[in-house]
Amino acid sequence: MKIIILLGFLGATLSAPLIPQRLMSASNSNELLLNLNNGQLLPLQLQGPLNSWIPPFSGILQQQQQAQIPGLSQFSLSALDQFAGLLPNQIPLTGEASFAQGAQAGQVDPLQLQTPPQTQPGPSHVMPYVFSFKMPQEQGQMFQYYPVYMVLPWEQPQQTVPRSPQQTRQQQYEEQIPFYAQFGYIPQLAEPAISGGQQQLAFDPQLGTAPEIAVMSTGEEIPYLQKEAINFRHDSAGVFMPSTSPKPSTTNVFTSAVDQTITPELPEEKDKTDSLREP
């Protein structure tokens, strides 16, 4: 019995890992996670506070970095061991950063190779071509628009339209009316003496009215178109003028200054005064 018990203790002590070995339970879990390369998992970031207890595994880290990022083969094993001992969680991040820098450097190199052909033709070759191309175009535009700005409208010859002989004298008289007569302003014309004892009626400059019939120098009567009074004041001025002007009546001119309504009363009052005076 004693021998069996001693053999049991001996086997237990031999099987127990008294010295830290490279293959531990954590390493076995890392190896299982490293087999899932397609998922691109980061096993060192999943361990949390146990990172300080994990010794650096150069072989496993090399396989891990090569599996995730193939561009890290340039790093040596000693550098990986140092990074694993100091910051094991940030190793893939530094690798990705270095790979990104390498990718950027790879992108910059073709640009640097392409830029020298672009910078070879200096500005001395470009500027004369630009000036020689733009200057004649600008000069052509200047000569093209030069007559437009210099020729003034009143200097251009006016186009005279020949009048047709079928126009009546009334239409010709309407054409000879000045433009300011259309807005109600008619100047007061002089009254020339006309043979035959007739005189031309003067226009009224205040109301802007004209007589119905204007006598021409030839003696023919032509109806004047402007028969209505024209209000040439502003509507908001507060002055109202009738639209139709009454016909000029000359009856009161030739009548006596004494009112006719008072004249019948004068004999009656005279009779009353005479009857009162009689005894």
Curated annotation (Swiss-Prot):
Location relative to the cell: Secreted; Cytoplasm; Nucleus
Post-translational changes noted in the entry: O-glycosylated.
Transmembrane segments: none
GO biological process: biomineral tissue development; inflammatory response; odontogenesis of dentin-containing tooth; positive regulation of epithelial cell proliferation involved in wound healing; positive regulation of gene expression; positive regulation of GTPase activity; positive regulation of protein phosphorylation; regulation of actin cytoskeleton organization
Compositional bias ranges of the Polar residues kind: 243-263
Signal sequence extent: 1-15
Keywords: Biomineralization, Cytoplasm, Glycoprotein, Nucleus, Secreted, Signal
Ranges for region Interaction with ARHGEF5: 127-129
Carbohydrate-modified residues: 115, 119, 244, 249-251, 255-256, 261, 263, 273, 275
Stretches for region Disordered: 243-279
A Pfam family that the UniProt record links to this protein: ODAM
Coiled coil regions, renumbered to chain: none
One annotated Gene Ontology cellular component of this protein: nucleoplasm
Note: ODAM protein is the unique constituent of calcifying epithelial odontogenic tumors (CEOTs), also known as Pindborg tumors. CEOTs are benign but locally aggressive pathologic entities arising mainly in the mandible and commonly associated with an unerupted or embedded tooth. They are characterized by the presence of squamous-cell proliferation, calcification, and, notably, amyloid deposits.
Subunit and interaction comment: Interacts (via C-terminus) with ARHGEF5.
Free-text function comment from the UniProt entry: Tooth-associated epithelia protein that probably plays a role in odontogenesis, the complex process that results in the initiation and generation of the tooth. May be incorporated in the enamel matrix at the end of mineralization process. Involved in the induction of RHOA activity via interaction with ARHGEF and expression of downstream factors such as ROCK. Plays a role in attachment of the junctional epithelium to the tooth surface.
Record family assignment: Belongs to the ODAM family.
Protein name: Odontogenic ameloblast-associated protein
Source species: Homo sapiens (Human)
